Curated annotation (Swiss-Prot):
This is Putative E3 ubiquitin-protein ligase UBR7. It is linked to Li-Campeau syndrome: An autosomal recessive neurodevelopmental disorder characterized by global developmental delay, intellectual disability, epilepsy, ptosis, hypothyroidism, and variable cardiac and genital anomalies. Additional features may include seizures, short stature, hypotonia, and brain imaging anomalies, such as cortical atrophy. Its EC number is 2.3.2.27. A zinc finger (PHD-type) spans 132-188.
């Protein structure tokens, strides 16, 4: 036994050992990822006829539109049919895009699936991703010169991809947030800072009454005073952090409202603050104006948002106009999210996905079905017994062992057929 353990140890040092469970789990994970990205897109029909598709899997062809040419994007079906042998950049998914394949941007290629297309799609938006460059560092992915392992995260607004270390704030664990808005988009859509104080995952804590907020992050900060600040006295106090802790900024808003008994108590101060907030909301009917009534901190960082945060955005007439002016109306569309797209793909795949074994059985007559089931049971039993020997001895199963098993199994099968043995063993 000791000798067997020693041999197994030497084998494990020479060869990477991967369990069958690991292989199956990795295969299932890759299949699920592919289904999530591609399942919501048609792999056989060009999407051009659908107009600007709300969200679809996209590719850019470096062979047809290299850097220096006009950027162009192609749908999933065209990536297979028209660009199968070309060098492609996988763009994951993008919103409101119409397939460019074969239009005027492609000098020597006509779309095989739908050749009759307009010269250009004026509604499409392009960025450096279409030339295989990502993030503010404008590097390819994967980057052969980058030795730092880092997750790439897509901004929900501009849809560019960013290295986590280039976002100005350390990303939370991937399961702790659903979407990210990059630094540039937070500057352009500055109204989001009002929501970030309440919703963003980068916010560390909000104490009982919402008057004291501790926000942790990296980057410059700008204190935004309340818009109805005539009756408020706002002060910014910076605490000296304890050694080994991150910098923490403490913002405290003091109310100088009409005096009341025990006005120095926290509960009375909370009541006054909430009443003023409710009055502001009832007058304007705008969630954003209510949030802007509180003191905020704007920082030069990206922000990370939880599941369903978009449903908290105000949809009053003024805010909807603002979203339109900023070209971010999609933020109010629950079906715009990548998660919604992925769920749509998973449902479609689950509906279409068939069991190969059951498909094969259904095409056979009764005798053939019985024979196939018997063969399957024989294979299952013998393979289990064969692998059990390796487990008992503590040795690693190699490629040659599996090849040997199937050779022996086929040999036994031939002997059974030659002997006219028409029953299950």
């Amino acid at each position: 036994m000791a000798g067997a353990e020693g041999a197994a140890g030497r084998q494990s040092e020479l060869e990477p050992v991967v369990s069958l469970v690991d292989v199956l789990e990795e295969d299932e994970e890759l299949e699920n990822e592919a289904c999530a990205v591609l399942g919501g897109s048609d792999s056989e029909k060009c999407s051009y006829s659908q107009g600007s598709v709300k969200r679809q899997a996209l590719y850019a062809c470096s062979t047809c539109t290299p850097e220096g040419e006009e950027p162009a994007g192609i749908c999933l079906a065209c990536s297979y049919e028209c660009h199968g042998s070309h060098k492609l950049f996988e763009l994951y998914t993008k919103r409101n895009f119409r397939c460019d394949c074969g239009n005027s941007k492609f000098k020597n290629l006509e779309c095989k699936l739908l050749p009759d297309k307009a010269k250009v799609n004026s509604g499409n938006k392009y960025n450096d991703n279409f030339f295989g460059l990502y993030c503010i560092c404008k590097r390819p992915y994967p980057d052969p010169e980058d030795e730092i392992p880092d997750e790439m995260i897509q901004c929900v607004v501009c849809e560019d991809w960013f290295h986590g270390r280039h976002l100005g704030a350390i990303p939370p664990e991937s399961g702790d947030f659903q979407e990210m808005v990059c630094q540039a988009c937070m500057k352009r859509c500055s109204f989001l800072w009002a929501y970030a104080a309440q919703l963003a995952v980068t916010k560390i804590s909000t104490e009982d009454d919402g008057l004291v907020r501790n926000i942790d992050g990296i980057g410059d900060q700008e204190v935004i005073k309340p818009e109805n600040g005539e009756h408020q006295d706002s002060t910014l106090k910076e605490d000296v952090p304890e050694q080994g802790k991150d910098d923490v900024r403490e913002v405290k808003v003091e109310q100088n409202s009409e005096p009341c008994a025990g006005s120095s108590s926290e509960s009375d101060l909370q009541t006054v603050f909430k009443n003023e907030s409710l009055n502001a909301e009832s007058k304007s009917g705008c969630k954003l104006q209510e949030l802007k009534a509180k003191q905020l901190i704007k920082k030069d960082t990206a922000t990370y948002w939880p599941l369903n945060w978009r449903s908290k955005l105000c949809t009053c007439q003024d805010c909807m106009k603002m979203y339109g002016d900023l070209d971010v109306l999609f933020l109010t569309d629950e079906y715009d999210t990548v998660l919604a797209y992925e769920n749509k793909g998973k449902i479609a795949q689950a509906t279409d996905r068939s069991d190969p074994l059951m498909d094969t059985l259904s095409s056979m007559n009764r005798v053939q079905q019985v024979e196939l089931i018997c063969e399957y049971n024989d294979l299952k039993t013998e393979l289990k017994d064969y692998l059990k020997r390796f487990a008992d001895e503590g040795t690693v199963v190699k490629r040659e062992d599996i090849q040997q098993f199937f050779e022996e199994f086929q040999s036994k099968k031939r002997r059974r057929v030659d002997g006219m043995q028409y029953y299950c063993s």
